[in-house]
């Protein structure tokens, strides 16, 4: 679930301070990242509020990589993939 706190953090990550229709795009990207974490077996307790620093960073990195036409998308997706590897080995399963 994308909380308001997570949405605000994602907006800051993509350097967006105003609220408008693009907030829905950011929220959708965060939801995709959360579902991807769920897909690799992360327990729901870690995904309900995304307060764990590693989980939160993965979501924010995914949003940053995929929002708009980020010229650093490939580097950011590599960073996201590395975070997934760390999460897989970090005891985040139920």
What are these regions (language model features)?
Residues 1-94:
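Divalent metal-cofactor coordination and adjacent catalytic microenvironments
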């Amino acid at each position: 679930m994308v909380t308001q706190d997570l949405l605000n953090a994602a907006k800051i990550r993509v350097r967006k301070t105003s609220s408008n229709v693009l907030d829905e795009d950011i929220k959708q990207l965060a939801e995709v990242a959360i579902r991807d974490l769920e897909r690799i077996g992360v327990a729901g307790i870690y995904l309900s509020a995304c307060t764990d620093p590693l989980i939160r960073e993965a979501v924010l990195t995914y949003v940053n990589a995929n929002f708009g036409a980020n010229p650093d998308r490939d580097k950011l997706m590599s960073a996201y993939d590395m975070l997934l590897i760390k999460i897989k080995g970090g005891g985040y399963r139920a």
